[in-house]
Regions:
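N-terminal helical capping/dimerization or prosegment-like subdomains
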Residues: 2-98, 328, 345
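An extended, acidic, His-containing surface patch that forms the Zn2+-binding/catalytic region
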Residues: 79, 193, 251-328, 340-349, ...
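Active-site metal-coordination/substrate-binding segment of hydrolases
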Residues: 81-157, 448
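A common structural junction motif
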Residues: 90-91, 243-247, 351-361
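Short small-residue beta-strand/loop micro-motif enriched in glycine and branched aliphatics
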Residues: 117-121, 217-223, 318-319, 434-436
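Fold-level recognition of mixed alpha/beta catalytic cores in primary-metabolism enzymes, strongest
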Residues: 124-289, 298-305, 414, 438-444
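A generic structural motif
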Residues: 126, 217, 336-342, 372
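Oligomerization/assembly interface segments of phage tail-like spikes and tubes
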Residues: 209-212, 327-335
Length: 462
């Protein structure tokens, strides 16, 4: 067997013990958005440092004002080998609503779901602990067979991706010389379908905002004050309802500055993928497309901007009933950006729009929650071509190059601050329920994900 075949065989042999290691990491409740889990986030970072040390990496926990980073270096490859920076995140989303989980979210398991499929269940299986471990386990297989890796490898794992990555930019600035590589590898994306791997070449940007409207200085009796006193819930929902017009377009002033129409040849290539609104929405129990009228579901999710209300609350929400007019109402709103839309300009447009809707005797405050521009990568870069061929050798169907509706701010940071383009490869599926109860990761995604990184590292080094 060739070296790569021997490494692939070792990855297969290691699968059972690899799952045991993954489950150890999954049991750590590294929820970055909740301060109550600060110690768990550090525990996850320390676990990763300990494990990477067994693979020959020089690894360390790096403190930040928030949750720590993990940085590791493996210099076993030759000096002229390509240098790659692999990025992932060990933090996870909260598990609410806990009552909707079929199992303990932090007690992972393997489930047989029929038709030859098995899934890994638990928070972080797909986003992103399972994904990052595919790369780490590929490194393990190489070390056990060759004693070295085919590329020089630096690893960066962060613990605040799910909470807006507030410490990431300062950390990159302070450690740019140490972290700079030939290119970055990012494993926080997904497959096109169960048999078709994908490389994402475009990502939407993101702006997050929390808005709080305050009316009276306390909750009011709705019988005594109803009809006379301002109701902040009414004010807020009316303002938010006006974010879209009847055609689905967003009404903020200047919102579409920097948004270009998708070229016809690109739209034609997307049409060949066979993804209809019905098939796309049917996976989540819906059937009628929303958003801008007259556009395909792939254009809407890959190439058009959005405004979404992610949460809204105010007044009494407990058991039973309480007739009050709330003193405050709050919402969290996110915008996905495309083209050259400016996150700062979008944030200002939203704040101006909401502020203009607030009565004179009420007040409004805003809290930012991250902001990053859209990213476009070259469709014909040599790195992308090598990875595409390597993935095609592993999976039943050839790899494809796609857009991506989500945001990975680190990709823009790598490009802007370290001068590196990123290869975006992941093995999640659209039904993995990331950020939702009953998150899962296909066993074949994990297994073939490891094998895929074995092939990609070999291809990059060739």
């Amino acid at each position: 067997m060739t070296d790569v075949q021997q490494v692939l065989a070792r990855a297969d042999q290691n699968l059972s013990t690899s799952l045991e290691r993954l489950f150890e990491l999954l049991r750590i409740q590294s929820i970055s958005t909740d301060p109550a889990y600060k110690a768990e986030c550090r525990k996850a970072a320390e676990w990763l440092v300990g494990y990477l040390g067994t693979l020959g990496f020089t690894a360390s926990v790096r403190d930040t004002p928030g949750h720590p980073m993990v940085v590791a270096h493996h210099a076993g490859a030759s000096a002229d080998a390509p240098h790659v920076l692999f990025y992932g995140h060990y933090d996870v989303q909260p598990v609410d609503p806990i009552e909707l989980w079929e199992n303990d979210p932090f007690e992972p398991s393997i489930k047989d779901v029929g038709e030859g499929r098995k899934i890994l269940t638990g928070r972080g299986t797909s986003d992103d602990k399972g994904q990052l471990m595919t790369f780490v386990e590929a490194c393990r297989a190489y070390k056990e067979i060759n004693g070295a890796l085919p590329c020089r490898v630096t690893i960066l794992f962060e613990g605040e991706e799910e909470s807006g990555s507030p410490s990431l930019k300062p950390f990159l600035e302070a450690n740019a010389a140490e972290l700079k590589a030939d290119y970055a590898l990012v494993c926080d994306t997904g497959m096109w379908d169960r048999d078709t791997p994908a490389i994402a070449a475009a990502l939407r940007g993101l702006v997050g905002e929390e808005v709080i409207v305050t009316a009276a200085d306390r909750d009011l009796h709705s019988g005594l004050f109803g009809g006379a006193a301002a109701n902040p819930i009414h004010i807020l929902v009316e303002a938010l309802a006006g974010l879209h017009d009847e055609t689905g377009r967003i009404t903020l002033d200047g919102f579409y500055d920097g948004v270009e129409e998708t070229p016809d040849n690109i739209k034609a290539s997307w049409e060949t993928l066979g993804k209809t609104a019905e098939s796309f929405l049917g996976e989540v129990g819906l059937s009628i497309p929303s958003g801008e009228k007259g556009r395909s579901v792939l254009e809407l999710t890959w190439a058009r901007p959005t405004a979404e209300i992610n949460g809204i609350w105010g007044g009494y929400t407990g058991e039973g009933f309480k007739t009050v007019i709330a003193a405050k109402a709050s919402a969290k709103v996110s915008f996905r950006l495309v083209g050259t839309q400016d996150p700062a300009a979008i944030r200002e447009a939203f704040r101006s729009y909401i502020s203009a809707k607030i009565p004179a005797d009420c007040s409004v405050e805003f809290h930012p929650h991250g902001g990053s521009p859209a990213i476009h990568l070259s469709y014909d870069s040599p790195v992308l071509t090598k990875a595409k061929n390597a993935l095609s050798d592993e999976w039943p169907k050839p790899a494809i190059v796609i857009g991506m509706g989500g945001s990975i701010p680190i990709v823009g940071d790598f490009q802007k601050m370290l001068g590196m383009e990123s290869l975006l490869v992941g093995f999640g599926l659209s039904d993995d329920r990331i950020h939702s109860p009953n998150e899962k990761y296909e066993l074949v995604s994990y297994h073939k994900g490891i094998r895929s990184w074995v092939r990609i590292l070999q291809a990059l080094a060739a």
